[in-house]
Amino acid sequence: MADIHILVADDSAGQRLDAYLGANDGCPTRSACAHLIEGGAVAVNGETCLSKKCAVRAGDRISVDLPEPHDPTDVIPEAIPLDIRYEDDYLIVLSKQRGLVCHPAHGHESGTLANALVYHCGIDHLGTVQGEDRPGIVHRLDRDTSGLMLAAKDDDTQRALQNLIRTRTLDRRYITLVHGHIAMDEGTINTGIARSTRDRVKMAVSDDPFARQAITTFKVLDRFDSTRFDDGYTLVECHLFTGRTHQIRVHMRHINHACVGDPLYGKCDARADQGLTRQFLHSWRVAFDHPVTGERIECRDELPWDLAAVLDDLAPRSLGRTAAGDDIVPQLGLLEA
């Protein structure tokens, strides 16, 4: 993603957000900006704004996440298997496997989740609020993060689901294993997150006025004893109240407990990383009120084999589950649960 930061001048106050952005150098056309706004790519004073009609005010700090440019191409249907956990006429809940990119970008023009969704649903039966190259995509998971995701079959449903994220009523829970022992059994991390000024591939905790607010709560499920090769581990459930790029990975690094196996924010020590070649991070539970039917939807997803194998190996080193761990760990599909 490319970032654009704009400070609204006095003489621009009162303009519609899409019109204001469309007239700024570095931003695309007004209609393209409207799509970016509706897709959750625009923040005003650190908060995502989904209304293109919102009037800007003098002194507003606006951040725009522009997709990386790539050659325009139709998203070609590809028969990539989808692990669907719930589906109706409006939306899909699926489990994304590790290694699967969500949508086409440079270096990944095919073989993405978007290609699979077009094959499964047809391009005319997917929401395009996020852009023609991101059909159906409501929110993203990093390539090597596995687990539950949502896809929408029309624009109205896509907007409604993104609004659940904006209003923090889409309940998303992740399981991660981190280095070291987190001292407290639960906590909240509330910071700004912005692109790193040292490495543009990374995100970082930031107090920059243009940083976007990121809130993660966590509960410790289990701790595992240390050895001469590592500092021990903590198994954690994280609850996302916002959806910033790399949010959990950045927040865990911020409290000095990086996700095991994380190639960007972790230790990059094969032995300490338990042989993992990707971050130990899995979207295990989503729950929300269906935006059309009102039905309560809740899906859970056991850990994939590579992550489960790590925990099975660590089980003899357990220092004792917490009360939250007694409730959650048996639902993760572990041999030792």
Language model regions located:
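RNA pseudouridine synthases
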Residues: 1-188, 192, 197, 300-316, ...
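Short, acidic, Ser/Thr-enriched surface-loop or helix-capping motifs
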Residues: 37, 215, 240, 290-291
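Short Pro/Gly-enriched beta-strand edge/turn motifs at strand-loop
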Residues: 64-67, 198-202, 213, 265-271
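Short coil-to-beta-strand transition motifs
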Residues: 75-79, 206-216, 280-281
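Conserved hydrophobic positions within beta-strands
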Residues: 84, 178, 218-220, 259
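Pseudouridine synthase
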Residues: 109-121, 153-157, 166, 191, ...
